[in-house]
Regions:
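Short secondary-structure junctions
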Residues: 28-35, 90-95, 158-164, 220-224
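Conserved active-site tyrosine of GNAT-family acetyltransferases
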Residues: 19-26, 84, 111, 149-156, ...
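N-terminal beta-strand motif that seeds the catalytic metal site of vicinal oxygen chelate
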Residues: 1-18, 68-70, 119-150, 178, ...
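Vicinal oxygen chelate
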Residues: 1-2, 81-132, 138-141, 210, ...
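Conserved short beta-strand elements that form part of the metal-binding/catalytic scaffold
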Residues: 30-65, 113-120, 160-194, 242-248
Length: 255
């Protein structure tokens, strides 16, 4: 199976209009997609889309993204933190300095976990990280058994393991988004998986990709759903993180 890219990160919301205003006016880190409607709103980061997913599309109650799930690059972390704090955004403690980067986790609207991030040190190979403000540096994928998770993301999904991964920090790459396998308990957080359909993997043929994953033991309780513009097939990784196969077959309207 070939994952072409991540089409979007699903951000669960209860009130779509309120969430739209929050992402536009409070966070002000991403560009609102002009194709958004009163039923589906998207914000474009530098490398990936964040889709605000109302409860109508995710029955079963509101489940927010867990702690520090969506990690967003900024140039001036202290300045951005001050700006957001003045707008009522709640940060978790004083943030951290890992020795190579600074981070400031915060709780976005509806309890969704996000984090401001700035890497200041070059990578081990000497390369300097370069990306604009608003780039999603990675999505933190909570795991309880890293070896099992590596077998799934590198084996079943066929993603490339980042060669800069270490014994304590492992990343897998799509063409546009990094997935970091993290054990939240090492940061004093409770393990909570990503809610349903949080990461939408673009594939050329949903039915074929689904069949291939089923041979690896992956289950698709909802089968394949036709939304009228795309085919989707929700599934979970071994830790219960909500993922999705996605293929849009309808033409994309011009902006």
């Amino acid at each position: 199976m070939i994952v072409e890219r991540v089409d979007f990160i699903g951000v669960p919301v209860r009130d779509l209009a309120e969430a739209d205003a929050y992402f536009r006016d409070t966070l002000a880190l991403f560009e609102r997609d002009p194709r958004s409607s009163d039923r589906w709103v998207e914000y474009d980061a530098a490398n990936v889309t964040l889709a605000l997913v109302p409860e109508a599309y995710k029955p079963g109650g509101h489940e927010p993204l867990p702690f520090a799930s969506v990690v967003v690059r900024v140039d001036d972390l202290d300045g951005e933190r001050s700006r957001l704090s003045e707008r009522g955004v709640e940060f978790a403690g004083d943030g951290f300095d890992s020795g190579v980067c600074n981070g400031a986790p915060f709780v976005a609207l509806e309890g969704n976990g996000m984090m401001l991030h700035r890497r200041y040190a070059p990578f081990a190979d000497g390369q300097v990280p370069e990306a604009p403000r608003g780039h999603v540096d990675f999505v933190a994928v909570p795991v309880q058994d890293r070896d099992r998770a590596e077998g799934f993301y590198g084996g079943a999904l066929g993603l490339e393991r980042n060669p800069r991964s270490t014994d304590t920090w492992v990343e897998y790459e799509t063409s546009n988004l990094t997935l970091a396998l993290v054990d939240p308990t090492t940061a004093g957080q409770e393990f909570k998986p990503l809610p349903g359909a949080s990461i939408a993997f673009r594939v050329a043929d949903v039915e074929a990709a689904k069949a291939e994953l089923e041979t690896a033991g992956v289950e698709f309780p909802a089968g394949i759903i036709d939304s009228g513009v795309c085919h989707i097939a929700p599934f979970s990784d071994p830790d219960g993180n909500g993922l999705m196969l996605h293929h849009r077959y309808a033409p994309v309207q011009e902006r």
